[in-house]
A protein has these predicted regions:
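Conserved protein kinase catalytic core
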Residues: 20, 68, 78-80, 205, ...
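N-terminal metal-binding scaffold of metallo-dependent hydrolase/deaminase domains
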Residues: 1-52
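Short, glycine/acidic-enriched loop or turn micro-motifs at the edges of active sites
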Residues: 75-77, 136, 229
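Short coil/turn connectors at secondary-structure junctions
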Residues: 6-8, 54-56, 62, 126, ...
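Divalent metal-coordination and catalytic microenvironments
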Residues: 15, 32, 37, 63, ...
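Metal-coordinating catalytic core of metallo-dependent amide/deamination hydrolases
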Residues: 141-245
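Alpha-helical scaffold segments that flank or form the walls of functional sites
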Residues: 83-150, 174-188
């Protein structure tokens, strides 16, 4: 008998396939053919025909669940470098007494790249194929994602120096930087989607948030923000503006 076309790079056989189709069908003992990094077919198993696919590698998934890649919808991926630094603390204490000080001291393009590559490797190892990120030096993170071949929504991080003293010049600077970032990664296709990330209502003024949100809307880009995370945040925003977040 002849083989079935060009050889496969990988053939996955056995196990149970969770399709995530509208009916959430589960297939028993499927055959999944992969060539050049793409799934080219999914079929019901026919054991006598497996050899016809001539795969370079065969993965026996017996006893396993085969499913589409996981999606991590909220990351600041280089912060893997701060793992274990300060755990189980109230948010504002964690940020102001621990995270913000070490970010000011250690965060640069080199540490962001190292942390991004480590965090991405851990995500891939655990089955995550897409993540949505927001941080400093986001172009460095986007480049690391492209290098690793993982799908990324990359949000350029925006903070005000002092939300009580934001000037029109500072807001114009935010918008120009945002437009430059979106333009740089506009050709990312489905694997790299540029976004804008205002950190939070307690680190970005309403004027900054509105201007950045409008920039995202104008470019058709996602807009990301932390909001209403804790009761303390509600108290902070109520004190500042007389309204909840």
């Amino acid at each position: 008998m002849k083989s079935c076309g060009a050889p496969l790079d990988i053939l996955i056989k056995g196990g149970k396939l969770l399709t995530l189709s509208p009916g959430k069908e589960i297939w028993d003992n499927p055959l999944i053919g992969i060539r050049d990094g793409r799934i080219i077919f999914i079929e019901e198993a026919h054991a006598p025909l497996v050899s016809l696919y001539n795969p370079t590698e065969t993965i026996d998934a017996s006893g396993c669940l085969v499913l589409p890649g996981l999606v991590n919808t909220h990351t600041h991926v280089p912060m893997v470098c701060f793992r274990g630094l300060a755990d189980d603390l109230p948010l504002m204490e964690w940020l102001e007494d621990h995270i913000f000080p070490v970010e000011r001291k250690y965060i640069c393009r080199e540490t962001v790249r190292a942390g991004a590559l480590l965090g991405i490797a851990e995500m891939i190892l655990s089955g995550t194929t897409t993540f949505c990120d927001g941080y400093f030096y986001e172009s460095t993170i986007a480049g690391a994602a492209r290098e690793a071949g993982i799908r990324c929504v990359a949000g350029m991080g925006i903070f005000d120096a002092d939300i009580g003293k934001v000037t029109p010049k500072e807001i114009v600077g935010h918008v120009r930087a945002a437009e430059k970032f979106l333009g740089k990664w506009a050709d990312g296709g489905s694997m790299l989607i540029p976004a804008l990330f205002c950190h939070a209502p307690y680190t970005c003024s309403p004027e900054t948030i509105r201007a950045v949100k409008e920039t995202a809307r104008r470019h058709g880009a996602p807009f990301l923000i932390h909001v209403a995370e804790t009761a303390t945040e509600k108290d902070i925003i109520m004190k500042l503006y007389g309204n909840g977040p």
